[in-house]
């Protein structure tokens, strides 16, 4: 572990020290990353509503939207759905959903998406038909290239056995990735055992048919897509003319907000070595995915925290995560009204909690600080463009 950490830190330090200096302090690359977690997407929904509200107040603009402030918005599974909601344009070329619309969306559609009566005894728990229907209604024919800012939505192709990352910046090289947002959102949410895999086809630059056979993005990038989102931001900084002064991304000029959907309490549904000593394949299968996702999410946060701290840029990274979910709130598919109300409470209470044991700043205070940085950076860009 120590060797891995040292190598990772060394790589990022080399990147940072050899990268060009930003022309001005206000020129930052801003990234929003949203975890997967099914109905638990209500938790980041609460956080996003608070952040967007702060931006509207600071800029005295009720029409301000998150897509106006972030260069890259990435998500996996339910996080991919939220990414699409806040970046897909409406008829006025503004995001079709404000952050305040996210939680009502879950309350209205969650019980139908996670309706166990639609599943089969042998097969996925849910048939996915309502999910696909509502995605088509909300997102229409909109494709990746129309997103109002750069996006990074992951999925996994079970035929090619490779991850598939949908971004605007990849379209010049891979035009077949310019898929409908409805197809992408279903694919990134199609968790094995919960929803059927998704098949659809697009066209290559030669007009040939290109087929996708996709499942949940968490299979490709784990539940926390922060590292994926950062890599997309790095590529944009290298290729986008708007970032000509920062061809090599300096982490001191990267602003990263990563939103989780909650993890179990340390003592909730854990197991001892004695208890599991005689477990077989079936018993392990029931818990191994949860363990793997929790560990991967923790390590992603650990690596990012280490890098930002060692580069003296710890204030540029904020991970908002509830680590003490219990009972029904731990379930990704409990869309009962009672549980959704509990998830709202989790999100609202999270805002009042300290960021960490070593940092007494509350998440609410940290998000206000982030909002100020986002607002100032947007104003800087606007002023620069006017000259």
Swiss-Prot record:
Tissue localization of expression: Tuber.
Family affiliation: Belongs to the patatin family.
Note: Patatin have a dual role as a somatic storage protein and as an enzyme involved in host resistance.
Domain PNPLA: 32-230
Pfam family, any one: Patatin
Keyword Glycoprotein included in the entry's annotation: yes
Record function comment: Probable lipolytic acyl hydrolase (LAH), an activity which is thought to be involved in the response of tubers to pathogens.
Motif (GXGXXG): 36-41
GO biological process, one term: lipid catabolic process
Active site, UniProt feature: 77, 216
Protein name, UniProt field: Patatin-03
Residues linked to a glycan: 115, 203
Enzyme class: hydrolase
Enzyme Commission number(s): 3.1.1.-
PROSITE patterns listed in its UniProt record: PNPLA
Motif mapping: GXSXG: 75-79
Organism encoding this protein: Solanum tuberosum
Short sequence motif DGA/G: positions: 216-218
